[in-house]
């Protein structure tokens, strides 16, 4: 069984492109995806849930604030209950806890959600400043001891996040923007990276990731304005020289 972190709008294409995510032969509308962990309520991270509505009940892990935002803005729980149903799970926030399967069995994985600074998504019907709007997930394999940190939306690098990055064997990190004014230079009046809730590679994350001892360091959530997407760019050369991989479809590594 597999754990999915966020469900993007192209989740069905991702499933079709991954042999391990195919249903068992003869299984009607089956899936080896056991649960979905949401890092926040952004549309790019949740629209794929609607594409998964025709199978068994969805097991979704997310902070209560994220759940409330999705129910208020997208009517998610009632809508899903009209199809496959949805079961919500509150992730542990301090100590690692087991990922329990729908059938009651425990996964070999344990996890915890690290609270990050963040704002509600644009579709939110009411601006809330309380609660946890964005998290990173740190996951440990009890069989191997390997640790993975997944942080696709980082508005600021808290000390808790920094410590988790230092102790992880693999880090998948927010690579949305290279520079603070990336969008502004293309379209005057656009928001800055900070206003959109992202640290930049040039000012923050590149030096941090370079310093880590993790075996695998990967940038994800990369905006199409980011010059690192061009293999010949000087920005891409800096990233690769730091031992960081640009995330891509089909990328695999073992923790």
Describe the residue ranges of each PLM region.
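Beta-strand-turn-beta hairpins that frame and shape the catalytic cleft
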Residues: 1, 96-112, 141-148, 255
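Structured loop/turn residues at beta-strand edges in well-structured enzyme cores
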Residues: 31, 84, 107-109, 166, ...
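Metallo-beta-lactamase
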Residues: 63-135, 244-250
């Amino acid at each position: 069984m597999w754990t999915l972190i966020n469900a993007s709008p192209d989740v069905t294409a991702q499933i079709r492109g991954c042999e391990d995510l195919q249903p068992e032969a003869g299984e009607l509308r089956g899936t080896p995806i056991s649960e979905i962990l949401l890092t926040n309520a952004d549309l790019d991270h949740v629209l794929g849930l609607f594409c998964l509505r025709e199978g068994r009940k969805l097991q979704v892990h997310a902070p209560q604030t994220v759940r409330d935002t999705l129910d208020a803005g997208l009517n998610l729980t009632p809508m899903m209950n009209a199809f496959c149903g949805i079961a919500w799970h509150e992730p542990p926030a301090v100590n690692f806890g087991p990922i329990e399967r729908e059938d009651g069995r425990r996964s070999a994985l344990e996890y915890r959600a690290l609270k990050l600074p963040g704002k509600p998504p644009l579709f939110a019907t009411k601006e809330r400043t309380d609660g946890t709007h964005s998290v990173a997930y740190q996951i440990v394999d009890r069989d191997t001891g390997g640790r993975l940190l997944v942080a696709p939306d980082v508005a600021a690098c808290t000390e808790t996040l920094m410590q988790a990055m230092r102790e992880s064997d693999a880090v998948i990190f927010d690579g949305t923007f290279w520079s603070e004014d990336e969008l502004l230079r293309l379209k005057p009046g656009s928001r800055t990276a900070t206003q959109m809730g992202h640290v930049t590679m040039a000012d923050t994350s590149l030096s941090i990731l370079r310093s880590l001892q993790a075996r695998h360091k990967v940038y994800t959530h990369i905006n199409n304005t980011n010059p690192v997407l061009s293999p010949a760019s000087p920005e891409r050369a800096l990233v690769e020289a730091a031992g960081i991989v640009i995330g891509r479809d089909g990328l695999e590594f073992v923790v």
